[in-house]
């Protein structure tokens, strides 16, 4: 059974006679963003799961509260392994509307992956009690290149918090350069009221875990949310 949420109500429903998607299902990838389900093994990295001929055209991949972007040095971000039967947005760099790429997930031998240590534990994003937010069906991610805090050095216990007009819309533990911060958007539900909408520019603050300080992040290079 699954459920849907309308306002503060929950409606339960069941899907009968569903046909499982075969592991070798072939997807058609069009320009820009495509929402597809992952059919492989839990914990397989992006590079191991995507065929080379598709990966070279990928810009970024977004899951529920996690994201990765491809750089010259490989993939960076909080999404480093896929989770079976979860949906992912694959955004590509195809510019020709008539170009279609076809692919199937690479599903290697599971025992071989374990023996080679290539399967990663799928990590759910941590949350911070005083800065909780709701997962939205609309989300964007901001990647931090570097932060200058004079004499303060960030640790892996510190957090970056995203706000929209003083409403917390995302948070992520500091993970060094290219830490990605989710910024949730308003998707019509009460739980996301006040969240980002097209054109909004979120604010960011740093939460120092050791002292409880909340420091403003000043940047002139924050793209509008969309």
Where do the model's predicted regions map?
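N-terminal exported-region signature
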Residues: 1-226
